C-alpha cells in the first residue's frame, strides 16, 4: 500500500498531494523594519507545485477560488487549489498551432501566453506571445476553451506587436501593457518583427492605441498604484535593469516619467531580473528582481527580499492580500503576508 501511495504521489509531482506538508525554499532578508510589517519574519516560502517548464502570469480567480498561471513553452494554463494542487486549465493559451514552432532560438520556444488579468467584466484576458496579441477568452471561467476575441493585435502605426507580455487595467477601463520580443521565434532578430523597438502602450476603451514609451529595451512587468496616479514598468535588460514610474493624469494619459530604481549592478549576483510586479493596497511594490521578490516602498526604497533561489518571474496576491503567490522558473511558491 505504501508503494502504491508513493507511486501515485510521484505521478502527481506537478500537482502535489492534497494535505501534504509542503517543502520550503529560500529565506527572508530584511533591510528595514517596515519589511517585517509586510512579511512575517517567521513566514516560510512554500513550494506548492513544481515540475513546470517556465511559468508566468499568476492570477487569482475569485469566482473560481483558484490560481491560474501560464506554463509558457507547452502553451497552456494550469490552475492551482489547495484541495487539488495543480491541474490542467487551458490548452493553446498563446498560440493555436503546434509548439515548438520551427526555427525558434533560445532554450525553449515562448509561444504560450504570458501575463494574465481579469477584464472589468470578469473575463480572462491573456497576453499571447505566439498570436502576438492581447485577447479575451470568450468562454466562462468555469468552462475554459481556447476561443478568443482579439482586443488588440496592432500598434498605433498599424504594425504587428512583438509579443505582448503583461498588462494592467486602469479604473477607466483602459489597458496598459508591455511588448518586448521574447515570444518571437527568433527573438529580437526575428524576420517577422515589424517594429524596431519594444513598446509600452495604452489601449483605450474605444480601441485607440497610444505609445507611452519606446525607449526601454525589454519592458516587462507592469502595475498601477492604488490611487491610479502612477504606472510602474520593469525593464528586464542586463545593462539597464530598472523600474520606471510614469505619472498619470486623471484620464490615464501620461504627464511625466522617471527612473524609480536602478538595479543594474545587482544583475548576475543572484538569479533574476526586474520582471513581474504587483502593488498592495498601501502602495508597497512586490517586484521580482535579482534574488527573488524585492519589496519596495512607493518611492523605490528596498525594504527587503523574499529570496526564492530560482529565477522569480511574477507574483499575485490572494483576494485578502494575505498571501503572495510567486512563479519561479519551474516552481510555484507561496508565502504568507501580514
Label each region the model flagged.
Residues 2-10:
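Sec-dependent signal peptide recognition
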Residues 17-338:
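Sequence-structural signature of mature extracellular/luminal beta-sheet repeat domains
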Amino acid at each position: 500500500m505504501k508503494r502504491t501511495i508513493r507511486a501515485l504521489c510521484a505521478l502527481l509531482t506537478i500537482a502535489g498531494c492534497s494535505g501534504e506538508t509542503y517543502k520550503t525554499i529560500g529565506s527572508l532578508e530584511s533591510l528595514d523594519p517596515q519589511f517585517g510589517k509586510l512579511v512575517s519574519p517567521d513566514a516560510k516560502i512554500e513550494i506548492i507545485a513544481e515540475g513546470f517548464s517556465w511559468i508566468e502570469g499568476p492570477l487569482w480567480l475569485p469566482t473560481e477560488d483558484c490560481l491560474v498561471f501560464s506554463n509558457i513553452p507547452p502553451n497552456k494554463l494550469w490552475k492551482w487549489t489547495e484541495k487539488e494542487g495543480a491541474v490542467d486549465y487551458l490548452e493553446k493559451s498563446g498560440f493555436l498551432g503546434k509548439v515548438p514552432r520551427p526555427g525558434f532560438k533560445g532554450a525553449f520556444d515562448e509561444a504560450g501566453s504570458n501575463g494574465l488579468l481579469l477584464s472589468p467584466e470578469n473575463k480572462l484576458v491573456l497576453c499571447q506571445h505566439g498570436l502576438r496579441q492581447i485577447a479575451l477568452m470568450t468562454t466562462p471561467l468555469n468552462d475554459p476553451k481556447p476561443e478568443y476575441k482579439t482586443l488588440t493585435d496592432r500598434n498605433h502605426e498599424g504594425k504587428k506587436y512583438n509579443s505582448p507580455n503583461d498588462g494592467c487595467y486602469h479604473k477607466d477601463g483602459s489597458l496598459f501593457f508591455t511588448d518586448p520580443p521574447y515570444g518571437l521565434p527568433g527573438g529580437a532578430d526575428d524576420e517577422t518583427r515589424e517594429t524596431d523597438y519594444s513598446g509600452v502602450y495604452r489601449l483605450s476603451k474605444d480601441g485607440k492605441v497610444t505609445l507611452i514609451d519606446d525607449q526601454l529595451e525589454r519592458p516587462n512587468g507592469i502595475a498601477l498604484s492604488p490611487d491610479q496616479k502612477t504606472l510602474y514598468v520593469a525593464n528586464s535588460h542586463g545593462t539597464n535593469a530598472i523600474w520606471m514610474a510614469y505619472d498619470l493624469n486623471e484620464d490615464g494619459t501620461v504627464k511625466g516619467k522617471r527612473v524609480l530604481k536602478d538595479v543594474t549592478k545587482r544583475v548576475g549576483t543572484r538569479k533574476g531580473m526586474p520582471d513581474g510586479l504587483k502593488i498592495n493596497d498601501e502602495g508597497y511594490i512586490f517586484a521580482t528582481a535579482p534574488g527573488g521578490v524585492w519589496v519596495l516602498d512607493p518611492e523605490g526604497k528596498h525594504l527587503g527580499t523574499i529570496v526564492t533561489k530560482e529565477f522569480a518571474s511574477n507574483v499575485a496576491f490572494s483576494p485578502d492580500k494575505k498571501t503572495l503567490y510567486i512563479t519561479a522558473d519551474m516552481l510555484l511558491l507561496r508565502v504568507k503576508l501580514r
